[in-house]
Each structure stands twice: as structure tokens, then as C-alpha cells.
């Protein structure tokens, strides 16, 4: 059985925040805007004017920065007395996840407005919840994907370049993970088989990022969107998001379980973690040295890590084994063409760190 899921509508371009009123009125007449205070101050005037013109009543609810049960309860208490038709998340991944949790409790329509392109959470129905010490406590799901994703590339172009690098890292891995899921016969996050469309999107995402990644980072350095940035934002947010949910994930994302358990890598952005995970996965796939070396050059050109040290790691061999052990315990590690043990991950990490590739090793 094939299952493919996606947002109902996706809008991207320079200045599209001014269109939010006419987009929201398709979904309802009242909205809660969940955003950190700094983000809200930056764009509230445009949103308010657009909503007033469209006849959409809006209210800002402050997001305090962490996706905890307590924060979700606080957000819920702020709007439960007058339940809105729509919850609009404005900001990064944490704001979006907290808003997804709120939307699920309110049974409202869901809109995401990412202000950065560091990951593909805006299109997905999945959200994560942490405890007060930032330990993962739950991975939960909305009943469906967001009703609308709206991405203003003028705003994205003004964010720090490292955030776009992280988005490139999160996107570039998807082709290889979806391909592994196909080879392993694994299900996607919807519980069905990955489709030809999901694989095509993953490959288009990779091709776009390889072609336009460096130019898009140059656009961010200038603070002005251009065609390269438009292409890369579409790849990082839309193509990558559709590919991972409908195609599946593998070793790159399994590595985040291990990397998040050791000092240094644990503090790295998700997209940087999974990018390093791709180098490990390519070694496990026994890719040719020339292919891996080419990937490493692309990583260096786009601000992605080519070693554990570049993720902030300064640990021991015992820490490397911890990374490996937690990686093979992650559910996504089963989505690989053969069964793996911790020793396989250690060997692949050592190959990445030393440059002594595993291709041709029995």
C-alpha cells in the first residue's frame, strides 16, 4: 500500500507575508498567531494590516522558546476561552512544533510560516516534545499535515547563513535515505510504502541543493532573495518535507539519536547532525571514494561538517561507541539494505574521520 501525505497549500516568494489575510480567510475568520516577541515585532504590522483587510480577526500569543508540556498548557490556556479557527505558527522549528501541539488540542486549522529554512518541519504533521532539561519525551502527530505553509523569502534571506546551511544539510540527505527505504522495503512515516513521487522529490531536492546551494548562501550573505535562494528554500522546506514523510528516513536521521547524546554534537543544529550522518551512511553503503570526496567538498562549500570535531566533539572512543550504539537502536536504522550493529557504525565513523574509506572492504 502506497501512502503520500502533504500540506493542502504551499505559498512561497518575496513579500508573501502581505498576502496572509487572503490566504487565511480560506480557512476561517479568527486566528491565533504563535510567535516569539522579537519575531512578532518584526512582522506584526504587515500581518495585522493584511488580516484586517481580509476580515480575519487575529491575536498574538507569545511563545517562550521551548516545546514542553508546560509551555503547551500555557499556550492552550491563553486561547481556550475563545477557540480560534486557525493556529498560525511564525518562527523556527520549536515555534512550529509547539503550535502543532496547540492546534491538535484546539482542533483548529494549522498554518506554518517559517522565518528560517533550517529544516522541513513546516510541511510535516509530526512534532516533538521535550522535558525541562531538553530531553526528548515524545514524538507526536497531528491528524493531518498543515492546511497552509507560507514562506516569505525576504524574511528567510535576512536570517543567519548557518541556518540555511542546516536546511541544506537536512535536505541533501533525503535522496539517500529514501533510496535506502526503497531497497529495504521499509514503510514511510504514514505507515505505507514510499511512492515513486516521493523518491523523485528526494532526488529533485538533492539536485537543486547541489546546483544552487552555494549561490543561495551568497544571497543570504547579501540579505536579498534571488532565484537560487528561491530554489533552495523550496528544496529545504517543501521537497525535503514531502520526501521524508512520504519516502522514509534511514541512517542519517538515526545518527541524531547518538549525536544528541554526547557533548558538542548535542548542541549542533539538526541539519548539521544529519549531514554528518550522511557521510557515515555513504561509508556504510560502500560508496566509491571519489563520490564521498566530492560530497565532502560540497559540504565544505556550504558550511556543513566533515568531521565530528566540526560538530564540536572532543570526546573519547567510548563516546564514539555511545553514538554508534544509540544509532543502531533508533527505529530509522532498520531502514537500511542490511542489518547493522554498533561496530558497523564505529567503523564508518572512523572512515569518515580518517579518510580511509570502506569501499572495497570485505
Go through each PLM region and give its residues.
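ATP/NTP phosphate-donor binding region
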Residues: 1-86, 308
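Solvent-exposed alpha-helices and their adjacent loops that cap or buttress functional pockets
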Residues: 2-4, 24-26, 79-82, 103, ...
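A short, small-residue-rich loop immediately preceding and capping a beta-strand
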Residues: 79-102, 106-116
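Active-site segments that bind and position negatively charged phosphate/pyrophosphate groups
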Residues: 189-301
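C-terminal charged capping/lid subdomain of soluble metabolic enzymes
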Residues: 287-362
Amino acid at each position: 500500500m502506497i501512502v503520500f501525505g502533504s500540506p493542502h497549500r504551499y505559498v512561497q516568494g518575496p513579500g508573501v507575508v502581505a498576502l496572509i489575510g487572503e490566504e487565511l480567510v480560506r480557512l476561517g475568520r479568527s486566528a491565533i498567531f504563535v510567535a516569539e516577541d522579537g519575531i512578532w515585532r518584526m512582522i506584526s504590522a504587515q500581518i495585522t494590516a493584511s488580516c484586517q483587510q481580509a476580515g480575519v480577526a487575529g491575536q498574538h500569543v507569545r511563545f517562550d522558546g521551548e516545546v514542553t508540556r508546560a509551555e503547551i498548557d500555557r499556550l492552550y490556556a491563553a486561547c481556550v476561552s475563545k477557540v480560534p479557527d486557525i493556529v498560525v505558527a511564525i518562527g523556527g522549528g520549536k515555534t512550529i512544533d509547539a503550535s502543532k501541539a496547540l492546534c491538535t488540542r484546539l482542533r483548529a486549522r494549522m498554518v506554518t510560516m517559517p522565518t528560517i529554512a533550517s529544516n522541513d518541519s513546516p510541511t510535516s504533521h509530526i512534532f516533538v516534545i521535550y522535558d525541562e532539561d531538553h530531553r526528548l519525551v515524545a514524538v507526536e502527530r497531528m491528524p493531518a499535515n498543515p492546511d497552509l505553509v507560507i514562506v516569505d523569502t525576504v524574511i528567510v534571506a535576512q536570517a543567519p547563513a548557518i541556518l540555511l546551511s542546516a536546511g541544506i544539510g537536512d535536505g541533501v540527505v533525503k535522496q539517500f535515505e529514501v533510496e535506502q527505504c526503497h531497497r529495504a522495503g521499509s514503510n514511510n512515516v504514514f505507515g505505507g510504502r514510499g511512492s515513486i513521487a516521493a523518491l523523485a522529490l528526494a532526488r529533485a531536492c538533492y539536485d537543486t541543493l547541489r546546483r544552487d546551494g552555494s549561490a543561495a548562501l551568497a544571497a543570504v550573505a547579501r540579505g536579498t532573495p534571488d532565484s537560487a535562494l528561491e530554489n533552495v528554500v523550496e528544496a529545504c522546506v517543501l521537497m525535503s518535507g514531502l520526501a521524508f514523510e512520504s519516502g522514509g528516513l534511514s541512517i542519517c536521521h538515526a545518527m541524531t539519536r547518538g549525536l544528541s547524546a554526547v557533548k558538542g554534537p548535542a548542541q549542533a543544529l539538526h541539519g548539521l547532525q544529519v549531514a554528518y550522518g550522511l557521510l557515515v551512511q555513504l561509508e556504510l553503503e560502500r560508496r566509491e571514494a571519489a563520490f564521498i570526496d566530492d560530497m565532502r567538498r560540497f559540504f565544505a562549500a556550504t558550511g556543513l561538517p566533515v568531521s565530528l570535531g566540526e560538530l564540536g566533539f572532543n570526546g573519547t572512543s567510548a563516546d564514539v561507541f555511545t553514538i554508534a550504539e544509540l544509532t543502531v537502536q533508533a527505529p530509522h536504522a532498520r531502514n537500511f539494505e542490511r542489518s547493522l550493529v554498533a561496530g558497523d557504525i564505529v567503523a564508518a565513523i572512523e572512515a569518515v574521520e580518517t579518510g580511509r574509506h570502506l569501499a572495497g572492504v570485505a
